[in-house]
């Protein structure tokens, strides 16, 4: 048996996630700029439309689609040719607490951030029990990432946010991480 060692430079490069670091820092800056950095953050790896549709689509489209079941609404949204419905839901979400961050780091992982203090839960199927805005959670939805890429991006995101001059570190209040996808565990087709 032999011990294999790596040079300090190689160890640093292997542990330094260039794209993931840029991705995470961009997102943490947006959280900071919107006073969301210290709120409870729930990280969800999912299709970009899933959380947005589940929060905003049922009440927004119920009458228009004459639907009695939320799943009928979700099915209508996933039908090709319903771009106008999808756009309507996205516009509503952007007006009511969703921030969309298109990736510019090279990870190709876009992000949606939902500030639940701006969501009127009486118009959703959900409730929020937090008493004041500082306690209301932030839903952080990252487009599906798997394997090494998921590890790299989450690893970098969970690190404290550093100021530009690197003198102050701010820790995130991560309440949960949900990275379970449907791939291989549920029936259905792509986009379900």
What spans do the regions from the language model cover?
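Accessory terminal and edge-of-domain segments that mediate assembly/interaction
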Residues: 1-192
């Amino acid at each position: 048996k032999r011990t294999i060692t790596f040079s300090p430079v190689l160890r640093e490069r292997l542990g330094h996630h260039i794209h993931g670091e840029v991705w995470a820092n961009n997102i943490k800056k947006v959280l900071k700029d919107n006073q969301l950095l210290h709120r409870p953050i729930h990280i969800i790896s999912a299709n970009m439309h899933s959380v947005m549709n589940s929060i905003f689509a049922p009440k927004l489209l119920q009458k228009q689609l004459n639907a009695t079941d939320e799943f009928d609404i979700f099915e209508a949204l996933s039908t090709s040719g319903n771009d106008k419905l999808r756009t309507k839901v996205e516009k509503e979400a952007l007006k009511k607490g969703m921030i969309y961050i298109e990736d510019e780091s090279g990870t190709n992982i876009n992000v949606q951030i939902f500030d639940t203090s701006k969501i009127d839960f009486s118009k959703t199927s959900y409730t929020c029990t937090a008493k004041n805005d500082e306690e209301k959670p932030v839903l952080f939805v990252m487009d599906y990432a798997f394997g090494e890429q998921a590890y790299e991006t989450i690893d970098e995101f969970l690190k404290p946010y550093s100021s530009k001059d690197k003198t102050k570190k701010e820790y995130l209040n991560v309440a949960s991480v949900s990275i379970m996808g449907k791939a291989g565990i549920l029936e259905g087709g792509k986009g379900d």
